[in-house]
């Protein structure tokens, strides 16, 4: 049997187990849909886990600054996948910590928008498609990650997780973040997307020698040099590249602690 298939099947099974565990243990769950490759895989896995239909809302915290292709993707597949789509706007930048660097401050609007959505809907669990290999701060995360009453993350106080034993009880008055693809890599995401024929936003594919490896707000996200015009070529490129996945994200190039400050305050 193809070893790649074995590996992807194992990843899929573990992620589906985590999704079902979260659904069984939490009363009011939602899946955060950023519209990027990772959260699209998350929706695909959730549809598989629950026999074709996602049984909890898909929450898009909208900055109003995404690429047009991302909004077109959301509108099409929100309907096609029959999602209970909740689109919640972010507040203006005036509501954000003014001591943050410019790009981080712009990105932090999502944190404030997420806090408003939590207050509005009362979710006790939020599923997010982050991965440990993306960024150093996310490498410190847990699969079931408790948040404080204001949505904050205490990086120094994370519960141990051994042998698939998870603490799936949210703190009083707070919520859990659930990360079912935390153990995946960027290459895993693309290999699975190819195998499952998951729809993608065309910005991920090269045009005129450029493509986006990571998608965010249009004003703080930039393409990288690439000739990869299909997923097979993306996978080959990833085997050789030394360029970080988030090289096109402006906030990752600001102060050394900017991203961790965002995540401690409740960012994804």
Label each PLM-derived region with a short phrase.
Residues 1-268:
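Nucleotide-activated chemistry modules centered on ATP-dependent adenylation/adenylyltransferase
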């Amino acid at each position: 049997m193809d070893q790649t298939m074995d590996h992807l099947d194992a990843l899929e099974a573990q992620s589906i187990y985590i999704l079902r565990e979260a659904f069984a243990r939490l009363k009011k769950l939602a899946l955060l849909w950023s519209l990027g490759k990772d959260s699209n895989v998350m929706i695909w896995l959730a549809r598989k886990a629950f026999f074709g239909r996602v049984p909890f809302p898909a929450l898009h915290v909208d900055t109003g600054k995404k690429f047009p292709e991302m909004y077109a993707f959301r509108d099409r597949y929100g309907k096609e996948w029959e999602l209970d789509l909740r689109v919640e706007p972010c507040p203006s930048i005036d509501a954000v910590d003014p001591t943050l660097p410019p790009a981080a401050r712009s990105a932090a609007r999502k944190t404030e928008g997420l806090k408003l959505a939590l207050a509005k809907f009362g979710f006790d669990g939020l599923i997010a498609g982050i991965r440990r290999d993306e960024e150093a701060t996310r490498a410190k995360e847990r699969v079931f990650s408790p948040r404080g009453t204001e949505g904050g993350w205490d990086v120094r106080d994370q519960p141990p997780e051994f042998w698939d034993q998870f603490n799936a009880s949210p703190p009083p008055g707070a919520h859990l973040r659930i990360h079912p693809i935390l153990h995946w890599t960027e290459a895993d995401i693309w290999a699975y997307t190819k195998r499952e024929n998951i729809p993608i936003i065309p910005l991920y594919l090269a045009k005129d020698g450029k493509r986006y490896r990571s998608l965010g707000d249009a004003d703080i996200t930039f393409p990288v040099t690439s000739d990869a015009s299909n997923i097979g070529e993306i996978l080959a490129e990833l085997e050789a590249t030394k360029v970080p996945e988030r090289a096109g994200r402006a906030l990752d190039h600001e102060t050394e602690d900017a991203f961790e400050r965002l995540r401690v305050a409740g960012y994804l």
